[in-house]
């Protein structure tokens, strides 16, 4: 029998019952105050309109600032991604869920229909046709004219060089195209639509997985106020909105308070607390908001609200911070992080300069973000990935694991198909992404350890009650 009253998660998995004012100056204790019991009887499964895709959001302190962003506004330069890692569960998953239409996932060379190795000279092409076109252009080769319009395919492509070169030109290969590097978005969408249609016709199950992916994306967009697409546009200066105010030292922090309204914290001049503590508390408030957003998103994952209520709470307790740091990466580049819904940008060096232990909190998140961003996921990928994180059947204290694993198994299939369609050239992306789940758990563990240090050293500082409950007995 499922308990209908529990002392942990706010009503209806939101945070309506938790007052953000609990962080007032008069609350200076880390002791966990008992919560009143919460009635979960009002929880109901959301209505799914045709299984639709979703909105991402920053998980940072709510400060807002301004200044020259030029030196921070360059395109993201990221480090190499982590090497592929296969857990025992991953290997088992791959064995039991081999994609029956793998051959369909391989994009064909537009010239000879061999397997394309990538996007070369403006089109998808195999290594053979890429090299042939490059040699022809560089050496300025002229072939004997042929009027037979020879058919060019894998076995015959070397028989008539004239017709092969004409086919290269006909499908759109161009020496100038190499400078653009990536496929134009319109061309990419057209190609993916063609591939998806072929796959759906031959494998009806994939149509269901793509419908699930779309539903998760739509829910994601509705649940989170700042998507990765919006954040990257701000970070790279590709938006018509005003550039974010840059916080890089104490003076710019003071100036920022004159330009941006603080959502949770009164102006610096009216505060007796030092900046490090105030920034830390701002992060707490933003985290509480993020918990609410993630909870709303979780309720839209098909099957989640049908799980045991205690298990729903456990999954959220262990999953929310892993998701917070996943989505925080979207707001970061190697130099800093967007804050206040993109209105401000706080530099990495400034955060690192805060006194210990506060200066140690963000650096591991930056290190993770640089590598995670190298995977070049978009919001539709992230929507499925965070659902996979939530539905992790190995969380401590779960009462009924099987239905959780069944849901996650379906999500893993949807994620693998999504990555193959959205990143056809990144064959190891699925494995790399699963490795990031392990990295995220380590980051959360280190974060909890730092909180234990603060609990002992900062006697005049409080931790939000909801976060206290989440961190209690966490790793």
UniProtKB/Swiss-Prot annotation:
Motif 9aaTAD: where in chain: 465-473
Spans traversing the lipid bilayer: none
Zinc finger (NR C4-type): 109-129, 146-168
DNA-binding region location: 106-180
PTM notes: Phosphorylated at basal conditions and dephosphorylated when treated with the ligand. May be dephosphorylated by PPP5C. The phosphorylated form may be inactive and dephosphorylation induces adipogenic activity.
InterPro entries (UniProt xref): 1Cnucl_rcpt (IPR003074), NHR-like_dom_sf (IPR035500), Nucl_hrmn_rcpt_lig-bd (IPR000536), Nuclear_hormone_rcpt_NR1 (IPR050234), Nuclear_hrmn_rcpt (IPR001723), PPAR-gamma (IPR003077), PPARgamma_N (IPR022590), Znf_hrmn_rcpt (IPR001628)
Taxonomy, superkingdom: Eukaryota
Domain NR LBD: 208-473
Reported regulation of activity: PDPK1 activates its transcriptional activity independently of its kinase activity.
GO molecular function list: chromatin binding; DNA-binding transcription factor activity; DNA-binding transcription repressor activity, RNA polymerase II-specific; E-box binding; nuclear receptor activity; transcription cis-regulatory region binding; zinc ion binding
Subcellular location per the Swiss-Prot or TrEMBL entry: Nucleus; Cytoplasm
GO BP terms: cell differentiation; cellular response to insulin stimulus; fatty acid metabolic process; negative regulation of cholesterol storage; negative regulation of inflammatory response; peroxisome proliferator activated receptor signaling pathway; positive regulation of DNA-templated transcription; positive regulation of fat cell differentiation
One Pfam family in the UniProt entry: zf-C4
Any one annotated GO CC term: cytoplasm
Keywords, ordered alphabetically: Activator, Biological rhythms, Cytoplasm, DNA-binding, Isopeptide bond, Metal-binding, Nucleus, Phosphoprotein, Receptor, Transcription, Transcription regulation, Ubl conjugation, Zinc, Zinc-finger
Location in chain, cross-link Glycyl lysine isopeptide (Lys-Gly) (interchain with G-Cter in ubiquitin): 222
Region called Interaction with FAM120B, residue ranges: 175-250
Residue list for modification Phosphoserine: 82
Quaternary context: Interacts with FOXO1 (acetylated form). Heterodimer with other nuclear receptors, such as RXRA. The heterodimer with the retinoic acid receptor RXRA is called adipocyte-specific transcription factor ARF6. Interacts with NCOA6 coactivator, leading to a strong increase in transcription of target genes. Interacts with coactivator PPARBP, leading to a mild increase in transcription of target genes. Interacts with NOCA7 in a ligand-inducible manner. Interacts with NCOA1 and NCOA2 LXXLL motifs. Interacts with ASXL1, ASXL2, DNTTIP2, FAM120B, MAP2K1/MEK1, NR0B2, PDPK1, PRDM16, PRMT2 and TGFB1I1.
Known role: Nuclear receptor that binds peroxisome proliferators such as hypolipidemic drugs and fatty acids. Once activated by a ligand, the nuclear receptor binds to DNA specific PPAR response elements (PPRE) and modulates the transcription of its target genes, such as acyl-CoA oxidase. It therefore controls the peroxisomal beta-oxidation pathway of fatty acids. Key regulator of adipocyte differentiation and glucose homeostasis. ARF6 acts as a key regulator of the tissue-specific adipocyte P2 (aP2) enhancer.
Entry comment, domain topic: The 9aaTAD motif is a transactivation domain present in a large number of yeast and animal transcription factors.
Family of this protein: Belongs to the nuclear hormone receptor family. NR1 subfamily.
Annotated protein name in UniProt: Peroxisome proliferator-activated receptor gamma
Origin species: Oryctolagus cuniculus
């Amino acid at each position: 029998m499922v308990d209908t009253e529990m002392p942990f998660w706010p009503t209806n998995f939101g945070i309506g019952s938790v007052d953000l004012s609990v962080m007032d100056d008069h609350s200076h204790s880390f002791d966990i105050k008992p919560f009143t019991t919460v009635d979960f009887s009002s929880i109901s499964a959301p209505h799914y309109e045709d299984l639709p895709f979703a909105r991402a959001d920053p998980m940072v302190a709510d400060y807002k600032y301004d200044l020259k962003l030029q030196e921070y506004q360059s395109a993201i330069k990221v480090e190499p991604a982590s090497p592929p890692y296969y857990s025992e569960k991953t290997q088992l998953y791959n064995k039991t869920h081999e994609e029956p239409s793998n051959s369909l996932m391989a994009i064909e060379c537009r010239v000879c229909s061999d397997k394309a190795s990538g996007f070369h000279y403006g089109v998808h092409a195999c290594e053979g046709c890429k090299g042939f076109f490059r040699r022809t252009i560089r050496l300025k080769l002229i072939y004997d004219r042929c009027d037979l319009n020879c058919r060019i395919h894998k076995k015959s492509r070397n028989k008539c060089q004239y017709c092969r070169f004409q086919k290269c030109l006909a499908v759109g290969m161009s020496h100038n195209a190499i400078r653009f590097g990536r496929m134009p978005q319109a061309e990419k969408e057209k190609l993916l639509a063609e591939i998806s249609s072929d796959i759906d016709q031959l494998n009806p199950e994939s149509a269901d997985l793509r419908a699930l992916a779309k539903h998760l994306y739509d829910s994601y967009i509705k649940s989170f106020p700042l998507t990765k697409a919006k954040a990257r546009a701000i970070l790279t200066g590709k938006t018509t909105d005003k550039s974010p105010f840059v916080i890089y030292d104490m003076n710019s922090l003071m100036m920022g308070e004159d330009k941006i309204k603080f959502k949770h914290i009164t102006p610096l001049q009216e505060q007796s607390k030092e900046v490090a503590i105030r920034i830390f508390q701002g992060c707490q408030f933003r985290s509480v908001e993020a918990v609410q957003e993630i909870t709303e998103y979780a309720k839209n994952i098909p099957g989640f609200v049908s799980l045991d209520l205690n298990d729903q709470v456990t999954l959220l307790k262990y999953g929310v911070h892993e998701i917070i740091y996943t989505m925080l990466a979207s707001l970061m580049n190697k130099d800093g992080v967007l804050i206040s819904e993109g209105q401000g940008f706080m530099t990495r060096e400034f955060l690192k300069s805060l006194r210990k232990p506060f200066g140690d909190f963000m650096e591991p998140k930056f290190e993770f973000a640089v590598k995670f961003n190298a995977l070049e996921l978009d919001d539709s990928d992230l929507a499925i990935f965070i659902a996979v994180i939530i539905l992790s059947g190995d969380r401590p204290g779960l009462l009924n694991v099987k239905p959780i694993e069944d849901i996650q198994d379906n999500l893993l299939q949807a994620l693998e198909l999504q990555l193959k369609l959205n990143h056809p050239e990144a064959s190891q992306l699925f494995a790399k992404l699963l490795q990031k789940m392990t990295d995220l758990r380590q980051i959360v563990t280190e974060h909890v350890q730092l909180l234990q240090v603060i609990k002992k050293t900062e006697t005049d500082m409080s931790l939000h009650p909801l976060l206290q409950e989440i961190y209690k007995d966490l790793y």
